[in-house]
């Protein structure tokens, strides 16, 4: 997945969201490429990893002191994610006529994953997180 860089006027929330999204992509790529957990490395696996990291960042943002600011940051993060989905699917060769259908299906998958993600923020040896990972496999 490749981050789109926007050339429009950016506000504080957009700047924070862009920096966080860059971190999400960097950590996701590092996790995907530095581990041998995955038999195959394709777009689906990349989507799942980015989704998990994005959900964790959204959760962390909700714990921050300035909740009003970080709610807007989360909105910007989701906008960046959807734009990135669109761009990366186009790069895969999906045409303009069907791109909306694919983006919509991936966004639905992401929101489903949010609803099933464990409530506990400590994911180490967390049984519900292990069940979540089995669910998305």
Locate predicted features:
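Generic transmembrane alpha-helix motif of multi-pass integral membrane proteins
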Residues: 54-56
